[in-house]
Amino acid sequence: EYPGCVAAYGIHPLYVAKAREEDIQVLRETIAREQPVAVGEIGLDRFVAERDDTQQLYYFVEQLKIAQTADLPVLLHVRRAIDQVLQQLRRIGVRGGIAHAFNGSQQQAAEFIKLGFKLGFGGAMTFPRAHRIRKLAATLPLDSIVLETDAPDMPPEWKVGARNTPDQLPRIAQTL
């Protein structure tokens, strides 16, 4: 229906509190039937105060297993949990993907790249205080970087308080 648009399916870590056990089976069946390009956005989010870490980990691992079985890459949402995510990726072995809104260290970046992942950079790197992440991005191989908007969220510095849109990508790329 929308030429050039493709789908990825997953249970975002901020929504696992609303998920049910049968959602994993529904996800498995939907992926087999619809053949999306990836599983995601999935991951771990240790930033929000009200969360169930055990439940997040369960849904993350189950979705990694689905991705591994379907031989699909994953789209990762990771906040304050990079090492835990890397541990599960090494343990389960998925076909790479994208670490969305990457904000880790040089060592963590190298580990993601070794596991077949691209690192996503977007609006967050345009803020003056984001010098560490800009410096890191500048050291990475160009083919390991994905520019992203996360529209309508995570606007660049010049759009604070406004809806983020894909037309901001060229200027975000200039910042990089």
Indicate residue ranges for each PLM-predicted region.
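Active-site phosphate/pyrophosphate- and oxyanion-stabilizing loops and adjacent acidic/basic residues
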Residues: 134-135, 174
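Structural detector of well-ordered beta-strand residues that form the stable sheet scaffold
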Residues: 6-8, 39, 75, 98-100, ...
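Mid-to-C-terminal alpha-helical segments outside catalytic/metal-binding sites
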Residues: 66, 169-176
